[in-house]
């Protein structure tokens, strides 16, 4: 593929912010209940192990990208041929569309439940997608800049991670490791959607200056995410009883309801509003990634592809009008992502490595 001009690239350290931004999305608000439902008070172990597995996958992704010296679109076709590679590119780009749609519509559900139950989904979707269109048309550097501020601005809420500690009962965590390893592995499923998004590296790798040197920042970013998610899981398990957590769909928001100020009665309104700074770069990244991927695969300019993708996600807002449908979308997205990332990418790496060795 063509070398990206340096004026369109970002510094290697920006990968740290790009990965954290897309990992700490809407899943962070309620991932605890799903894992706890599967493995109870050992859910924090599942979260920790899944975070470690993501670091392994980041290493594999960098092996693929460094050897292929391009993005996943070009690498798939170079390694597997035009048709098989093209099919796998279609699957990956479809998954990225679903990832963006799931993130946006799950956040819309949060807004409905916690703030504005009567507002139409299409109104919120239209406002977000309009902003995302403006951001994405500015190019990758603008998207990356929004991703940076998507970490900096919400960081003012970090104190909410510690306020509930005074009400935590850490005896809820015992006995530790009462579930089998297989059960804990199954519990990792509850963390998939929260951690996913790091695979966007497969698309924006060519836009990083001295991309090979950015790997350490990717690992650091996932380390931070893993620590945050594991801590939140431990805090949630200590704050809620098992029965209470089973009914807490948005566990994090339920916890911070206890925070009150003389001038703010419903502090969770602030949380949901500020969380938009996480969601905006999340959706923008996916829109940029899909439009860029289609440009590389089919030669269609991004400015023509982008409105079509946005229209598709907008139309979904008329159909994703209840919890069951959004849950189903979450499940499909997680399963497709798991198979592509944890099954296909290692196989691709092995085939690619074997081909390189045979050529030598």
From Swiss-Prot:
GO cellular component: membrane
Species annotation: Bacillus cereus
InterPro entries, per database record: Spore_GerAB
Family, per entry: Belongs to the amino acid-polyamine-organocation (APC) superfamily. Spore germination protein (SGP) (TC 2.A.3.9) family.
Keyword hit for Membrane: yes
PANTHER family: SPORE GERMINATION PROTEIN A2
Reported function: Required for the germination response to inosine. Has no role in L-alanine germination.
Topology within the bilayer: Multi-pass membrane protein
Keywords, alphabetical: Germination, Membrane, Transmembrane, Transmembrane helix, Transport
Pfam family, one: Spore_permease
Protein localization: Membrane
GO-annotated biological processes: spore germination
Name of the protein this chain belongs to: Spore germination protein GerQB
Bilayer-spanning residue ranges: 11-31, 45-65, 84-104, 116-136, 142-162, 188-208, 220-240, 270-290, 300-320, 331-351
């Amino acid at each position: 593929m063509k070398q990206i001009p340096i004026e369109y690239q970002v510094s290697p350290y920006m990968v740290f912010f790009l990965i954290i931004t897309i990992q700490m999305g809407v899943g962070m608000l309620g991932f605890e209940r799903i894992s706890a439902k599967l493995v109870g008070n050992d859910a924090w172990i599942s979260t920790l192990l899944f975070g470690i597995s993501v670091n392994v996958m980041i290493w594999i992704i960098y092996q693929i990208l460094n050897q292929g010296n391009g993005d996943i679109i070009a690498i798939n076709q170079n390694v597997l041929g035009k048709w098989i590679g093209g099919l796998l590119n279609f699957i990956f780009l479809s998954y990225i569309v679903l990832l963006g749609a799931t993130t946006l519509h799950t956040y819309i559900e949060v807004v409905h439940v916690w703030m504005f139950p009567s507002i139409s989904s299409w109104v919120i979707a239209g406002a977000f997608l309009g902003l995302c269109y403006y951001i994405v048309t500015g190019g990758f550097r603008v998207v990356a800049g929004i991703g940076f501020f998507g970490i900096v601005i919400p960081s003012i809420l970090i104190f909410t991670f510690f306020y509930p500690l005074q009400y935590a009962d850490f005896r809820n965590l015992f006995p530790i490791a009462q579930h089998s390893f297989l059960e804990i592995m199954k519990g990792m499923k509850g963390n998939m959607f929260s951690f996913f998004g790091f695979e966007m590296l497969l698309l924006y790798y060519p836009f990083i200056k001295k991309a090979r040197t950015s790997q350490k920042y990717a690992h650091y970013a996932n380390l931070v995410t893993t620590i945050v998610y594991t801590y939140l899981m431990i805090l949630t398990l200590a704050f809620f009883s098992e029965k209470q957590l089973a009914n807490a769909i948005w566990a994090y928001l339920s916890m911070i309801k206890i925070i009150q100020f003389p001038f703010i009665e419903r502090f969770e309104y602030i949380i949901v509003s500020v969380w938009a700074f996480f969601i905006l770069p999340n959706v923008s990244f996916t829109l940029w990634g899909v439009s860029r991927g289609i440009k590389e695969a089919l030669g269609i300019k991004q400015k023509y592809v982008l409105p079509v993708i946005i229209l598709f996600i907008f139309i979904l807002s008329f159909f994703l009008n209840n919890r069951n449908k959004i849950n189903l979308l979450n499940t499909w997205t997680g399963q497709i992502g798991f198979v592509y990332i944890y099954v296909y990418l290692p196989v691709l790496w092995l085939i690619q490595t074997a081909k390189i060795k045979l050529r030598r």
